[in-house]
Amino acid sequence: MLALVGLCLSSCQDPAKSRLYMDEGVKLMLNYSKFKEAEEALDKAVKYDKNNYDAYYHRGCLRVNMKKYREALADFEQAIELKPDFADAYFNMGRTYVLLNDEDRACEYYKLAAQYGRPNLDDYLRRCN
């Protein structure tokens, strides 16, 4: 029985399908502002490839736009777990903490974004002591 469950979990992963759903979700978000539909597509992207750090990242960005800040943070954290040098994910963690009125945590993530090569952070880092 456990072997069947393991087989299903591995066979249910489909990186190509994940990429298609991710691209669709990003298009719906950026071109049409269809946030609910975009979230559904990005949910499927994550379902089909649990290692697709870009899908978690884009879903995090979408959820910030939807004011689902805690869920966005979880997505950015997952993206960072999968790709520890993901500078844009650190930057967006910082932006999200600003929206949650937590400047100290925001500064931590802005500094990490800078450490991993995110350009144009001077204005953000000036707020940090």
Predicted regions and their residues:
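Helix-start (N-cap) detector for alpha-helical repeat units in TPR-like alpha-solenoids
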Residues: 17-19, 53-54, 87-88, 120-122
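Position-specific recognition of the canonical hydrophobic site in helix A of tetratricopeptide repeat
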Residues: 29-30, 57, 63-64, 98
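Conserved structural position within tetratricopeptide repeats
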Residues: 43-47, 77-81, 112-115
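Canonical tetratricopeptide repeat
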Residues: 58, 92, 124-126
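Terminal, low-structured helical/coil segments at or just beyond the last alpha-helical repeat
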Residues: 104-129
